[in-house]
Amino acid sequence: MAPFDFRKNKSMSSPDTLQIPTDLLPRDGRFGSGPSKIRGEQITALVADAPTYLGTSHRQATVRSKVGEVRDGLSALFNLPEGYEVLLGNGGTTCFWDAATFHLIAEQSQHLSFGEFSSKFASAAKEAPHIKDPSIITSEVGTHPTAVAEEGVDLYALTHNETSTGVMMPIVRPAGATGLVAVDATSGAGGLMVDANEFDCYYFAPQKSFSSDGGLWLALCSPAAIERIESLAASGRWTPAFFDLKITLDNSRLNQTYNTPALATIHLLASQIKWMNENGGLSFSSGRSRTSAEILYSWAEASDFATPFVTNPADRSNVVGTIDFSDDIDATVIAKVLRANGVVDTDPYRKLGRNQLRVAMFPSIDSEDVASLCACINWIVGNL
């Protein structure tokens, strides 16, 4: 096999033959942006409870108590003010976007669109025939726009962390706005600090910072959001039962889901929330991600072949880091060598189309492993 040219016009070693020294490798090589690394302790806890938990009815006390543990744990983790409630339903964040067009948006929404995922809720609202076309504020990838109060808008849709680009934004109610503030926190929740007083609905899925699996959505809802759900349900607006947030609300108050959930997902989620709360809460979990981010971005800034994709340091995500490489370095080859050596899922988001790596830094990922990843990349570049 001919050598693979890693740097242009130079003879290089084949990436297929490279073995990274074991003393450089991370202890755990999982850096995927979702599904994410699951801690071994979560698996051990699930196995211990499996005989009496798995394969049982989700409407019986065994599972409902675990759902209650999730709801109470999230209330504590996010220090939810009085009157806020935790809702959960099947289908993931994509399902929640559709549900929100029925029972959170009364007439019109405003959306900040600055990447693949932040644009999807805007598309869902635009395609819904029973509400007005949304107002959409965009910015270039690698940046984020700012919400502004707008007449007629009754819901402001923000995104805490744009998973596709590695941009995070502060969650603050738009000045002078009277509508609800709904935040897509799919990859940000649990890994970024947030003040519950700044949102009415903070929704996410558990396969990122919460080290569980997909197919479930959770939403932290203020009294105003609860009132919106109830009033739109009472208005007679037709809603498919799967997207009916009033049905979700009623079932959540009973510590259950409308239809059968994945029990393992709920158990893994409960274990992760417990781990976060027992070690100091959101300041602990977000602190772990912040430390990992400092390591990754400091390495990239000091490198002569890599640089953070997001130019404004304040906008660089603490949970999903995107690192660009110089034109004479092929990031796909780096990812290939890493994978061959057990360091997986560092590939960039496919639709972004950049010569970069994307590194998850969720709370379960040890900061020492992020440092080891950086050392591995240096070794690969030096040996290709």
Name each model feature, range by range.
Residues 307-337:
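Conserved PLP-binding catalytic core of the aspartate aminotransferase-like
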Residues 138-190, 201:
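Active-site phosphate-binding strand-loop segment of PLP-dependent enzymes
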